[in-house]
């Protein structure tokens, strides 16, 4: 593939248009597969090495971040996390394009954040054809266990996503949302300063 052809593919990817596995092959050098393997096998006592590996793997890493192994990523280099981030075990980033998380984000076990989907018609899925759209998770979002966040979603400031949800559309700030598909069930208000659970 010529440089001009690579630029054309990257432009299509950036626009959320369909592209194939063969067309995406030029991006393989950006994958952090070996470093992710090393991170997932780092002893808990080696916090400094774990931090160093995470800085090498991800596109950007804030201060006071915790990402418990194992985690998985298509690239790693397209993931950006802010300060005071906490990610629990079995977090999967399908980061064919950017996944950006703000400050104070908390993510429970067994999440999938996927920027990539595939065409519905089988004739369009030749050569693993797909499309990719970035995910944005704003500051102070809390995502419950076993949630799937789909391509192009933005979750607004301070919101809570209930366990087991499939988030396929944007969620506004300061709301509680849950379900499959994920829907807003209520706003977060000052009354929640004196309660413990989202449903009470």
Language model regions located:
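Conserved catalytic segment of ABC-fold P-loop ATPases
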Residues: 156-159, 172-174
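Conserved metal-binding segment of the jelly-roll/cupin
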Residues: 161-164, 170
């Amino acid at each position: 593939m010529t440089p001009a052809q690579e630029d054309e593919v990257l432009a299509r990817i950036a626009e959320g248009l369909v592209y194939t596995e063969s067309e995406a092959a030029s991006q393989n050098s950006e994958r952090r597969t070996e470093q992710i393997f090393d991170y997932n096998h780092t002893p808990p006592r080696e916090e400094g090495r774990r931090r160093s590996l995470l800085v090498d793997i991800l596109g950007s890493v804030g201060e006071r971040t915790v990402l418990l192994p194992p985690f998985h990523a298509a690239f790693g280099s397209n993931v950006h996390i802010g300060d005071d981030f906490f990610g629990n075990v079995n977090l999967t980033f399908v980061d064919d394009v950017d996944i950006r998380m703000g400050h104070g984000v908390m993510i429970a076990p067994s999440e999938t954040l996927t920027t990539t989907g595939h065409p519905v018609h089988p004739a369009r899925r030749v050569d693993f054809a797909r499309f990719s759209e970035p995910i944005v998770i704003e500051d102070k979002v809390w995502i419950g266990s076993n949630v799937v966040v789909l391509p192009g979603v933005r979750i607004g400031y301070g919101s809570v996503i209930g366990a087991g949800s499939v988030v396929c559309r944007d969620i506004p700030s300061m709301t509680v949302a849950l379900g499959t598909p994920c829907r807003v069930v209520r706003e977060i208000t000052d009354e929640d300063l004196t309660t413990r659970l989202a449903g009470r």
